[in-house]
Amino acid sequence: MIISAACRAVVNGEENVFPIMRHGDFYRWMKMLHCQYNKAAVEQGFIDWNEEKRIERFVSRAEAAKIAKECNQILPHMREEFNPNCLYSEDIY
């Protein structure tokens, strides 16, 4: 699964938008947002999902930034500094 370049745009111009996410953490976080956010995002074309419901790509920088900021509220226990490269990876899962 590839997270697109739009994810890296989440942190462009902003430092420490959200904490670092180790393998699997990003997927679990998005599952937590699924009921309240992802349905509308998918319908509007901001996020595409494959049959396994894993994130395929972001296509909107504004929406990527919005959910990145929500991460601080959802995973407050992750206090490490964010590394943009950890989100922009072909091997994130």
Region roles according to the model:
Residues 1-93:
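Short, surface-exposed polybasic-aromatic patches that bind anionic ligands, especially phosphate groups
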